[in-house]
Amino acid sequence: MTQVIEEAVKKVLEESKPRNFTQSIDVVITINDLDINKPENRLDEEVLLPNGRGKDVKIAFIAEGELAYQAEQAGADLVINKEKLEELGKNRPEAKKLANSYDFFVAQTDLMPTVGRFLGPVLGPRKKMPKPIPASANPETILGRLRSTIKIRVKDQPIIQSIVGSEDMTEAQVAENIDAIMDVLDRNLEKGSKQIKAMYLKTTMGPVTRVI
C-alpha cells in the first residue's frame, strides 16, 4: 500500500502546476458500511503525523503566570490570560473570530471552568475545546506535538478529508503521514482499513488523483 501511495503522490505533484506559494497535499477517504446515524461511528480522532503537516498551525495558549510566560517564549501564537478570557466572554463576535482563527487551544487546568464559561459556547460547536494541562507542563513539548497533529472527523457523510503534507515534502514523507491515518482507521473501524471504499489525493489548486 505504501508504494501505491508514493506513486500517487508523485503523480499528484507532477500534474500540479507551479504556484507562487507552497501548496498543501490533502487526502480524501470514503468509507463503506459506516452507519453515521450511530454516534459511535462518527470518528473524531487526532493523528500525529510523523513528518509534520507541512503547513503552519495556529495555537492559542490559555494560561497565567509562569506557564503563560513559558508558552510565549516557546512560540505560542497567542497567550490568553484570565482577564482576556473575561473580555472575550463579553464580546461574542471577537470570541467567534478567535475560534475561527486558531487550530488548537490549550488551557491551564485550573482555568478550564473559566474557559468553559466564556469560550465554551463558541469553541464547543467547533470541536476546539482546549486540552487541559497542569501548570508544570512543558509548553515547548506540547506546541511541538500539536504542530504535527491533524484531526480526522466523520460528520454527516462517511468521508474523511485532511491535510497530509505539502508539495515540498518527499513522496515517502507524505506516504508515511497517510500510513499514520490508516493506522488510526484500523483501530477505530470495525473492519479496519478494509472498509475504505476509495482514497484520493490532491494539491491545493491541482487535480484529484485516485489512489485506491
UniProtKB/Swiss-Prot annotation:
Provenance organism: Methanosphaera stadtmanae (strain ATCC 43021 / DSM 3091 / JCM 11832 / MCB-3)
Keywords on record: Repressor, Ribonucleoprotein, Ribosomal protein, RNA-binding, rRNA-binding, Translation regulation, tRNA-binding
Quaternary context: Part of the 50S ribosomal subunit.
HAMAP family: Ribosomal_uL1_A
GO CC terms of this entry: large ribosomal subunit
Coiled-coil annotated residue ranges, if any: none
A GO molecular-function descriptor: tRNA binding
TM regions (residue ranges): none
Pfam families assigned to the protein according to its UniProt record, in alphabetical order: Ribosomal_L1
Identification of the protein by name: Large ribosomal subunit protein uL1
GO biological process entries: regulation of translation; translation
Superkingdom field: Archaea
Family that this chain belongs to: Belongs to the universal ribosomal protein uL1 family.
InterPro entries: Ribosomal_uL1, Ribosomal_uL1-like, Ribosomal_uL1/biogenesis, Ribosomal_uL1_3-a/b-sand, Ribosomal_uL1_arc
Stated role: Binds directly to 23S rRNA. Probably involved in E site tRNA release.
